[in-house]
Amino acid sequence: MDVDSRMTTESDSDSDAAAQGGGGGGFGSETSSASPSAPGTPTAMGAGGGAAPIAAAAIAAAASAAVVAGPRPAPGYTVVNAAMEKKEDGPGCRCGHTLTAVPAVGEEGAPGYVGPRLILFGGATALEGNSATPPSSAGSAGIRLAGATADVHCYDVSSNKWSRLTPVGEPPSPRAAHVATAVGTMVVIQGGIGPAGLSAEDLHVLDLTQQRPRWHRVVVQGPGPGPRYGHVMALVGQRFLLTIGGNDGKRPLADVWALDTAAKPYEWRKLEPEGEGPPPCMYATASARSDGLLLLCGGRDANSVPLASAYGLAKHRDGRWEWAIAPGVSPSPRYQHAAVFVNARLHVSGGALGGGRMVEDSSSVAVLDTAAGVWCDTKSVVTTPRTGRYSADAAGGDASVELTRRCRHAAAAVGDMIYVYGGLRGGVLLDDLLVAEDLAAAETTNAANQAAAIAAASDIQAGREPGRYAYNDEQTGQPATITSPDGAVVLGTPVAAPVNGDMYTDISPENAVIQGQRRMSKGVDYLVEASAAEAEAISATLAAVKARQVNGEAEHSPDREQSPDATPSVKQNASLIKPDYALSNNSTPPPGVRLHHRAVVVAAETGGALGGMVRQLSIDQFENEGRRVIYGTPESATAARKLLDRQMSINSVPKKVIASLLKPRGWKPPVRRQFFLDCNEIADLCDSAERIFSSEPSVLQLKAPIKIFGDLHGQFGDLMRLFDEYGAPSTAGDIAYIDYLFLGDYVDRGQHSLETITLLLALKVEYPLNVHLIRGNHEAADINALFGFRIECIERMGERDGIWTWHRMNRLFNWLPLAALIEKKIICMHGGIGRSINHVEQIENLQRPITMEAGSVVLMDLLWSDPTENDSVEGLRPNARGPGLVTFGPDRVMEFCNNNDLQLIVRAHECVMDGFERFAQGHLITLFSATNYCGTANNAGAILVLGRDLVVVPKLIHPLPPAITSPETSPEHHLEDTWMQELNANRPPTPTRGRPQAANNDRGSLAWI
């Protein structure tokens, strides 16, 4: 193999005719020339669908922000005086190394917490020839490969301290000009060149999850990119490792290789991207934006000419990858530079031009602002390439840019801070650590939110055309908590602190709404009809479960749906040993969890003197505890994940959804029923949420304070009312100091299932540690095919798009966690414990993704069972929902709490008239958050607010009277209302608890249990 024993420091043969700045235009597949836009006219970056695939309004918003305020220039750097215990802890002088940011491990303040770190690996520590003289040609001094290292150094950002790591395991060989990227808390190393020539193509992983770091060599099947150096690598979409270009010892390359980290066995796949990509080159940089867009910047081509253009690479939903030229005019060509994203801004530093020359002065630091579609240097927006050098003493000159005049250095970002280490300047190796802060990061985020909101409105009005795709059916696979001294959880004493409007308290009798005297409306007769359709839907699934049990299949090893990218949740060892602490069957909840003696209620009136009034009612006024309403299970006809054209915009889908829908006070039902997201965006949102859900356990471990929500069933207006009255999950609301837990049944029955589920998923992606979702019985294809969600998807998105969306959502539902433990004292689930669940470990052992028909009786009981009519009915009884389902008595509740050292079960699943209902002497609470369920129940909706002191406060809203004029009176809405009414008439919910049951429901028979 023709490999030099050294790498020249700059260009092997230079040319003064450096490539000029990259062209403008939209960031899409139709951009094929480098002609710039009019000077100062920014364009936003998207991908995969033409010059301007994202909404024009969003582009205009970004451009407007750029014109009014102007994108911030590139920041200046300062030297960091880092500490180290001994000299060898510091990396020292070196170049050709890598610097990789690794996120924090654990919760800050908790034992074992490790803050964000920078991991420096390898590089060369010496030069060939006379290091005092800068090299000028191919025959002059270069990196001395005998001085290449395999050292690992760690910079702790929080403590500002360097240390040298000594990992166990088999380390990579010494090397420089290699690549590295982070995959979670692991650093992946590949390629490079060392004393023995080109390094092998093996992937080496430095695992930092344990206290003692460890090297692993990843086993990869089949052919790969082969040995090379001067190439680039990045993790795209938190999934695909992409390796591009470099030099194989003979020539520069332009090939693209991908490794799917979610598919085992691992294998490299050579990609053939469409569109105009970069020429064969080496010493470029590649950085991945958070939404999955990769930007390749600069480099040196086969003629040793430095390149100026930047290229974006994106993956379409149909599996295609596509190159597109980034907009804007680069201030300078460069190679052997460093680049890293901070939000939507790509920070580029240093670089060489060849012939001993480096990028200097204002152009030595540059930013590609992908929100505005422009390049900036330290002076201003760049409209023409900088051909000359700024004088250090000229007006506005900044001598600090001399710090960044270097090449062969490395950069990484932690939050809004950009770090640069080492490199080469004038033939001298550097050992300094630099830092800069991107002050524009917050502004970019705000601009993105604003643009997203405008884009959402534009989409609704214009009706965006979905991307190309096809589908087919395929079976796929926190803060410290203050508790009471004895550590117990408590159901109620002092009044919890008011939230938002709660300070307007009115407890006068004339304003109180007495729940026990509520009159039965016409809807009662309608609700009394047994829901035969729901019984049929669930009975088939239950029969399949029983058949498997008869055939001897283990309940704790349910069949799971599998997909190429499915990662099963970890199965924990079951321990069915009872804890020492036990509750007696006749006990009341011990000091610990307490139900507050007053519930907070919002007046039902929409206006007038009582409009929006909040008052508190005694819990004793909610004594009618036998009034629940019911409804409907699943064959999982899920579609294979199809890859649709994706728009690469910094206005990420979650931000767009939140900006469009999270309007607690101002949301109104859309006049047009067409949903504002297309399939591309639905797929993006589901992909992001699925990555989070798949990493969570089946039983979440949560901390107080927390708000708990019951069934929502597509009643998005009620969700907004609850957010308006009792706080919303946003930075302007209370997300910073209280978590949110939703107990399932997000879709079906109501008219806005799409709004409900997409907002909750967006909130989960935006606040993954603060917003928690578990699965309900309607999060299953068999059920939501019958009770509204499927027909809503088709009605609002068209048949093809709607069916695809319905399939994709149901595939996501199979990943949802199944229960949540709060402070190890309260367990939250959707249905109940039924006949089979005696220990929490049984739920923990359910592996996901899981479908209802592949699940066990444990899953059926968890999602479908109910408490008996009242505390006097013990044991197990048939359930009116359908054959094979059960209700469980207060003795089962007490036994379960005894077995698991728990004090309270919070569950949803049943429409209770007051929004919440106590059972088993207060050891179980049923929670329902949608009001006037199915338009007939006239029930209140409620949430539970659990404080740090473990006091539970119910907070209620009542049904609103119908508005006199609203968008709902439009002809389009009349059609929508007709199909929803017909659906509910054909598939009525189960009657309220305590009301007359259908004659054919033999609730006394135990023969089939």
From Swiss-Prot:
Record-listed Mn(2+) 2 binding positions: D745, N777, H830, H909
Keyword flag Hydrolase: yes
Keywords: Hydrolase, Kelch repeat, Manganese, Metal-binding, Nucleus, Protein phosphatase, Repeat
Entry binding sites for Mn(2+) 1: D711, H713, D745
Active site: H778
Entry EC no(s): 3.1.3.16
Kelch repeat extents: 136-182, 240-288, 293-344, 349-396, 417-463
Primary location class: nucleus
GO biological process annotation, one example: brassinosteroid mediated signaling pathway
Cofactor(s) in the UniProt record: Mn(2+)
Region (Disordered): 1-48, 549-572, 984-1009
InterPro entries per the UniProt record, alphabetical: Calcineurin-like_PHP_ApaH, Kelch-typ_b-propeller, Kelch_1, Metallo-depent_PP-like, MPP_BSL_C, Ser/Thr-sp_prot-phosphatase, Ser/Thr_prot_Pase_BSU1
Cellular compartment(s): Nucleus
GO molecular function terms noted in the UniProt entry: metal ion binding; protein serine/threonine phosphatase activity
SUPFAM superfamilies from the UniProt entry: Kelch motif (SSF117281), Metallo-dependent phosphatases (SSF56300)
Keyword Protein biosynthesis among UniProt keywords: no
Catalytic activity of the protein: O-phospho-L-seryl-[protein] + H2O = L-seryl-[protein] + phosphate; O-phospho-L-threonyl-[protein] + H2O = L-threonyl-[protein] + phosphate
Ranges of compositional bias, category Basic and acidic residues: 553-563
GO cellular component: nucleus
Cofactor binding comment, as recorded: Binds 2 manganese ions per subunit.
Compositional bias per record (Low complexity), positions renumbered to this chain: 29-45
Similarity-based family: Belongs to the PPP phosphatase family. BSU subfamily.
Name used for this protein in its record: Serine/threonine-protein phosphatase BSL2 homolog
